[in-house]
Amino acid sequence: NFTVRGRVIDAYGEPLIGATIREKGGANGTVTDVEGNFFLSVPDSAVLQISFVGYESQEVSVKGRSMLEICLKENILLLDHVIVTALGLEKKESSLAYAVQKVRGEELNRVKEVNMITALAGKAAGVQVSKNSSGMGGSAKVSIRGVRSVAGDNQPLYVIDGVPMLNSTSEQAYSAIGGTANAGNRDGGDGISNLNPEDVESISILKGAPAAALYGSQAANGVILITTKKGNTVGRRDIHFSTGLTFEKAFSLPEMQNSYGVSDVTDSWGEKENLTVYDNLGDFFRTGLTSITSVSVNSGNDKLQTYFSYANTTGRGILNENKLSKHNINLRETAVLFNSRLKLDGNVNVMKQTVKNKPVSGGFYMNPLVGLYRFPRGEGLSYYKENYERYDEDRKLNTQNWHTFTEDFEQNPYWIQNRIQSKDARIRLLLSLSANLKVTDWLTLQARGNLDYSADKLRQKFYASTATALCGMNGRYIEMDYQETQMYGDVMAMVKKQLN
């Protein structure tokens, strides 16, 4: 063997980045670099097969040459985009009767997001994506072609590699655990946020009624198809490492008046005064920070492909004590047997996540914004920040310290942050296996099975003197455990035959 060096270009002399070069009849192969260059060790009698998406493949005999320049011609027929459609089947975009948009995985990962689906914002026409106001670990709201229901669910159906995903949002009302409707809701997160965005190859968004026909009423709001990565077939091992930091700040704060002082209970404001201006709102929020680090190993050949990835996510929200830690492990094996007639594909995806002190959305009792907005203008909050509790001689314990005793309406926001503590833990397991058998040149059979299991635990502590309407005089301790399991399977026969 000797090393042959080459360069792959197009008709205009521009380098083709990522073109595949393989030794004919063997597993030896490589891809071109950013300059279109490649190096490959082959026998002097080897024949190289060069291919690139949208171009005609070419075979070149080495014949002992150490330097090659290969020019590929465009193939207009191959330039038609291939789209993953319903049930994970691939078709040319021009053959579809409904609207489809495709977003590549590289576009999703330009900005690191804890919830991968929020990275879709601004990348697909007609798709509206917004983060929930519940801080780290919260769910995302996605609507395709506008909101269809005012009170109902507008979320699309998520399908991973052809299998529908369990994407329930575990929003918990405090009224369900003995409180009242004024306590607000806790967002327990959604299923799609459990995925590692680095594992995503592409996302296809299906719009219109025909796109959702195969999935029934659960896809009434559209379908988001996620195709995950596999091992490569060029006989090399690629290791990819990435890390990113994201900073967050409160986007918009209300403008507060600074001309009128404190009123009595019956008036909205008091006398006009020359007030000292304090930035109590700005001081309450901090700069959020999210760190996402991932590593993946991609290897394989014509017969066996392997993809492995690990990702670690840590973050702190814009509210103090709101923290997140998440670990993702993914292993995918693909085997091609019996002269490419049988293809087996297996995937194991495990996620472990812990979120501390999720803030609530809405309500009075557990919402720190109520106390912040109603705090007297012209007074600073620093005293109540440092002294959010005081010792009660009668009860012989520390109780909440606040400028008013109307705890049925508002509480010290720093007491809420430090003395209402919660911990949400989730473990999620996704198992999938598929077999594809080419029976004849025109008949292919496919069988798939999937298991989606999640286990959630909530631990929450309300210290004594927290709003008695919710917690009583002595506080409250809550434990909640719940599990969800979804099993899915299908068998398909695909016929591809020319009818005269």
Language model regions located:
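Short, Lys/Arg-rich amphipathic segments at extreme N-termini
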Residues: 9-10, 414, 437
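Short, small/polar-rich motifs associated with maturation and membrane association
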Residues: 1-345, 349-351, 430
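Surface-exposed loop/interface segments of Gram-negative outer-membrane beta-barrel transport/assembly proteins
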Residues: 94, 152-155, 160, 166, ...
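Long hydrophobic segments that form regular secondary structure
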Residues: 297, 436-441
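Alpha-helical support elements that line or immediately flank enzyme active sites
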Residues: 182, 431-437, 451-453
